[in-house]
């Protein structure tokens, strides 16, 4: 699933659409729509300009002329593509005076929602991990009673971090994914806070991680996958100590870690 760095990269590649007017909007698959009639959505979008496109965690929100909001979540395999031919997995097409924007999703876990108000699903998210202060981060971490990997995946704690970057940040901070939040002292919390910011920044600079079929809106792959230190490296030697990387299940998700470098 595209996480914060991948979605941020997509949003940046969509910048040419800001200020452009939507000529037509076609929604071909009701499964990806959330609470909206396709004909009504098309009518509300046609003829209106896109005023801004921003990322909120893993969500994309385009503000539409007249006060509307178009929310998009890429799910597992969703793609937003500028131009190119429409295919069997193309579920929505926005046509502009010049060019098109396609929403492709082979597994159909992504979604599109139009609303006049700011999307409630987005409003319920926690703060951006690179905007929250350390004091607020540490205070909320202390209040939670769970395993640290589970907390990092909880989008009400901080938004946008998923399996890849939780594993990578925990490794850099030297914290075991099954460590209890109640046992993480302030010094280790600081290391984790810094590690989250560092790994997300580096991943954005690299265009994200293209592990399966992720590309940005221009069709470009990311290359941060070549910098992963633990994610999907089960059995390979730790880059710090040569101990084989291990995999455990936390909150029904695979977690990759070094048993020597990461402590509970």
Swiss-Prot record:
Positions of FPG-type zinc fingers: 229-263
Which positions are annotated as binding DNA?
89, 107, 144
Q: Which PROSITE patterns match?
A: FPG_CAT, ZF_FPG_1, ZF_FPG_2
Keywords, A to Z, come to: DNA damage, DNA repair, DNA-binding, Glycosidase, Hydrolase, Lyase, Metal-binding, Multifunctional enzyme, Zinc, Zinc-finger
Needs which cofactor? Zn(2+)
> Which Pfam families does the UniProt record give?
Fapy_DNA_glyco, H2TH, zf-FPG_IleRS
User: Can you state which reaction this protein catalyses?
Assistant: Hydrolysis of DNA containing ring-opened 7-methylguanine residues, releasing 2,6-diamino-4-hydroxy-5-(N-methyl)formamidopyrimidine; 2'-deoxyribonucleotide-(2'-deoxyribose 5'-phosphate)-2'-deoxyribonucleotide-DNA = a 3'-end 2'-deoxyribonucleotide-(2,3-dehydro-2,3-deoxyribose 5'-phosphate)-DNA + a 5'-end 5'-phospho-2'-deoxyribonucleoside-DNA + H(+)
Q: Name the chain's protein.
A: Formamidopyrimidine-DNA glycosylase
Species: Solibacter usitatus (strain Ellin6076)
């Amino acid at each position: 699933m595209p996480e914060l760095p991948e979605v941020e990269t997509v949003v940046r590649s969509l910048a040419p659409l800001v200020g452009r007017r939507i000529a037509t909007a076609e929604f071909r698959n009701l499964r990806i729509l959330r609470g909206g009639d396709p004909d009504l959505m098309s009518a509300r979008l046609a003829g209106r300009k896109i005023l801004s496109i921003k990322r909120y965690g893993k969500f994309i929100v385009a503000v539409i002329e007249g006060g509307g909001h178009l929310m998009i979540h890429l799910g597992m395999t969703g793609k937003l593509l500028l131009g190119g031919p429409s295919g069997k997995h193309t579920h929505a097409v926005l046509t502009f005076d010049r060019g098109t924007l396609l929403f492709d999703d082979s597994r159909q876990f992504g979604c599109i929602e139009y609303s006049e108000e700011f999307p409630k699903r987005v409003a319920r998210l926690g703060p951006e991990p690179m905007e929250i202060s350390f004091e607020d981060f540490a205070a909320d971490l202390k209040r939670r009673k769970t395993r640290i990997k589970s907390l990092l995946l909880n989008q009400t704690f901080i938004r946008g971090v998923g399996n890849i970057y939780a594993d990578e940040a925990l490794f850099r901070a030297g914290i075991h994914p099954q460590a209890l939040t109640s046992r993480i002292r302030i010094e280790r919390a600081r290391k984790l806070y810094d590690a989250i910011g560092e790994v997300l920044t580096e991943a954005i600079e690299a265009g994200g991680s293209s592990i399966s079929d992720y590309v940005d809106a221009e069709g470009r792959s990311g290359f941060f996958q070549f910098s992963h230190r633990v994610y999907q490296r089960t059995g390979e030697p730790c880059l710090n100590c040569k101990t084989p990387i291990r995999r455990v299940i936390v909150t029904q998700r695979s977690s990759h870690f070094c048993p020597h470098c990461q402590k509970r």
